[in-house]
Swiss-Prot record:
This is Tyrosine--tRNA ligase. NCBIfam families: tyrS (TIGR00234). InterPro entries: aa-tRNA-synth_I_CS, aa-tRNA-synth_Ic, Rossmann-like_a/b/a_fold, S4_RNA-bd_sf, Tyr-tRNA-ligase, Tyr-tRNA-ligase_bac-type, Tyr-tRNA-ligase_bac_2. It comes from Xanthomonas oryzae pv. oryzae (strain KACC10331 / KXO85). Homodimer. The lineage of its organism: Bacteria, Pseudomonadati, Pseudomonadota, Gammaproteobacteria, Lysobacterales.
Length: 403
């Protein structure tokens, strides 16, 4: 049986803040399974590793015997969460929201236990609300309080428009906790204002206020900006296993520890400390730790056999030994006259620009099927298929087709 200290250690792993810790301890001590909620607005069809930070924490609550609520914000998704935004979000259509929501349901059970998961839609209660009900809800907060939010304050100070419906978003998210009688709500650090709104509304409606647990925003592949599809620094959980492996193996050594803390369900805190000590002492190469994380992620979102095949493909390119046909084939569209190598590297996503590609060619850092490319003016035409590598970590198996 898990002790209170063990439960708190698992719940607190990677967390930025828990409000209020003493209330969490009291509810855990009661022995009654907690209702743990996290909301996801279906603004895009695919989830990426950044989204799984909250899903992993939900899974840890499930491991401790608690019930989690995966709340799909089909109603709030049409409003658009203003958190962290310096401009009004474009609202989504009902059709877009529902299509995205369907894909979410398919993806989350790669992490969550179906038996301990409620999937809910907040249109269940907001679809029944009258205009009078919404006005009553709006009366629970003031404009002055809303402007305490950093993003709203900045936009107000710089005379950027703030639409009235954006003020409603925190109230609507907060009311979700009332409707679901949540004991705990999880969210990113940028959601703290909205999560605290839930506490206040629950008290107003005579419920015990939920515990708020915030998680950090996961840094993307480059280790600086938060993971985002718009920035291209993400790993989608529906991506092929080879892409999950190769992208994970490209991250920096320091970022590896951060990802382990927020993404791994297999490596305990104690083991992570031990691994870090082994790397520091030189007993273990950082690549081995990264490979273990890559294997775990590829297995979670696919299966063990597929993960091992992906690792074999990655290893074949890195070492120059093995079967590179295990790598996924990426089609690159070229004109009839073909593309010079610099343009091909950029088109294949191996360099951010032709100038960077030219620099890599001058450094003799470009290989074709394991051989250094000596001719920086070489033109590639339809029918070419092979593995192109830039530096140690960037590679792709490409096939050229005429568009």
């Amino acid at each position: 049986m898990t002790t209170l200290d063990e439960s708190l250690a698992l719940i607190g792993r990677g967390a930025e803040e828990i409000l209020k810790l003493d209330q969490l301890e009291a509810r855990l001590t009661s022995g009654v399974p907690l209702r743990v909620k996290a909301g996801f607005d279906p603004t895009a069809p695919d989830l990426h590793l950044g989204h799984t930070v909250l899903l992993n924490k939900m899974r840890q609550f499930q491991q401790l015997g608690h019930q989690v609520i995966f709340l799909i914000g089909d109603f709030t998704g049409m409003i658009g969460d203003p958190s962290g935004k310096n401009a009004t979000r474009k609202p989504l259509s009902r059709e877009d929201v529902l299509a995205n929501a369907r894909t979410y349901e398919e993806q989350v059970f790669k992490i969550l236990d179906r038996e301990r998961t409620e999937v809910r839609f907040n249109s269940e209660w907001f679809g029944q609300m009258s205009a009078a009900d919404m006005i009553k809800l709006s009366a629970q907060h003031t404009v002055a309080r809303m402007l305490e939010r950093d993003d709203f304050a900045k936009r107000f100070g710089s005379q950027q428009p703030i639409a009235i419906h954006e003020f409603l978003y925190p109230l609507v998210q907060g009311y979700d906790s009332v409707a679901l009688r949540a004991d705990v709500e999880l969210g990113g650090t940028d959601q703290k204002f909205n999560l605290l709104m839930g506490r206040g509304l629950q008290e107003h409606y005579g419920q015990a206020p939920q515990i708020v647990l915030t998680m950090p925003l996961l840094e993307g592949l480059e280790g600086v900006a938060k993971m985002s599809k718009s920035l291209g620094n993400y790993i989608g959980i529906n991506e092929p296993a080879i892409d999950i492996v190769t992208k994970t193996m490209k991250i920096g050594d320091e970022l590896t520890w951060r990802w382990i803390d927020l993404l791994s369900l297999d490596i305990s805190v104690a083991e992570a400390v031990r691994l870090k000590e082994q790397v520091t002492s030189g007993e273990l190469h950082p690549r081995e730790v990264k490979l273990r994380l890559a294997r775990e992620l590829a297995t979670r979102f696919h299966d063990a056999a597929t993960a091992e095949q992906a690792i074999a493909g990655w290893h074949a390119v890195v070492t120059g030994q093995g079967d590179t046909s295990l790598l996924p084939l990426q089609e690159v569209v070229v004109p009839a006259e073909g593309l010079r190598i610099a343009s091909l590297l950029t088109a294949a996503g191996l360099t951010p620009s032709n100038s960077e590609a030219t620099r890599k060619l001058k450094e003799r850092a470009v290989k074709i099927d394991g051989e250094v490319l000596e001719d920086a003016t070489r033109v590639f035409t339809q029918g070419f298929e092979g593995v192109i590598q830039v530096g140690k970590r960037n590679f792709a198996r490409v096939s050229l087709v005429i568009g």
